[in-house]
Amino acid sequence: MIKEIIVIAILLISTLSFSQVTSSSPYSLFGIGDQVHLKSVEEISMGQMGGALNSEYQLSFTNPASYGNLSWTTYVFSGGNKTNVVDDGENQQTSSAAALTYIALGIPVNGNQGLAFGLQLNTAVGYSLLDQTFDEDGTLAEIDRYYGNGGTNRVFLGYGYKFPFNLSLGLELAYVFGSIDKNVSNRRNEVQLGTQALTDSNIKGTTVKLGAHYVQNLNEKLNLKIGVAVDLESTLKEKGDQLLYTFINAGDDSGFPIDTLNSDTFTSTIKSPLKTVLSAGFGEDNKWFIGAEYTFQNPLEFTGGIYENINFYRYDKFSNISVGGFYTPKMNSLNNYFQRVTYRAGINYQKTGLVINDTDINEYGISFGVSLPMGLKLSNVNLGFEIGKRGTSDNNLIEEKFYNFRLSLSLNDKWFRKQKIY
């Protein structure tokens, strides 16, 4: 059997729509696609560690309690490119995809509160797989093709409140929506008709996240920061249509449809159990910070509709361990630009929870990045890089090596702040 991976990604963006870009991963075939990191470029550049951070001018999406510490109105948007090198043990294929990953606005309120809202990429589907089977004499006997594209987005609204005793609490509400198209075709040598199965589905639902953040002053400069974030149990509904038909086998998948074998509608449910993020670290405000984060969740549950009678893959418990930090030599330096640059780095190891052919699909990565100041203000251009590996080529599976580049722009201003009159 020979696997050949071809991935095509398209991003369409307008003021009225945020269209999902496809992933470049064959693992996006499973469930509702690849789960995108719901974190800022700054957080991902520190090994995805961010739950203990509470900046006055940067958004941390991990913990909504951090919004209570905002002092500046902050507008951010981000995009990136992911390059995958996939290996099935016999062949390698390189593919890439680019996407706008988030747009968000954070607004301070009354000095101890903050609001944040925006649009984020949530999951991404994008794959094109070719399986070929040959007879003993080397003659091509059968071809199976698998196509998929789409995914989900989320609109969120977060609120944080900072109490006088260094404790902050936060809440985030989100609406998830999107669509996924999947196509499977089969052609056999010397058989006049091929078969094709089409699945089109729409997904929607709501999620709720709670957060808490505490700062303990160890001395005049050093602080200990602790963050806890909890995604409450949520359910997404997936509704769609399935169509199975025959087509004239003309040597490709462009044959003319002949007969409809089956046409049906379906409803599926995706249940996401409670997800907990524990994060802690210490450092000096606007100077340096080092921290660790542990995330864990019980298995996702896919039931009904297109997920009935699936036995070659399942979901187990999810967990992620991150360690990372940042360093800014001198934030207010007037003579040396590079002393005002913030340098970030981190590592992470993740058990994705996906199990295929009784084999766990795990992932690890190394990340680093910089925040480049724009002039003498707090606005920054953030660059992030990530190198890692997911999966294995053992047990007839695919190993994925990925190289991610991310870019975000963080603009800060004094909107809605009362001017002092002397």
What do the predicted segments below correspond to?
Residues Q20-Y422:
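Subset of outer-membrane beta-barrel
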Residues M1-S24, Y422:
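Bacterial Sec-dependent N-terminal signal peptides
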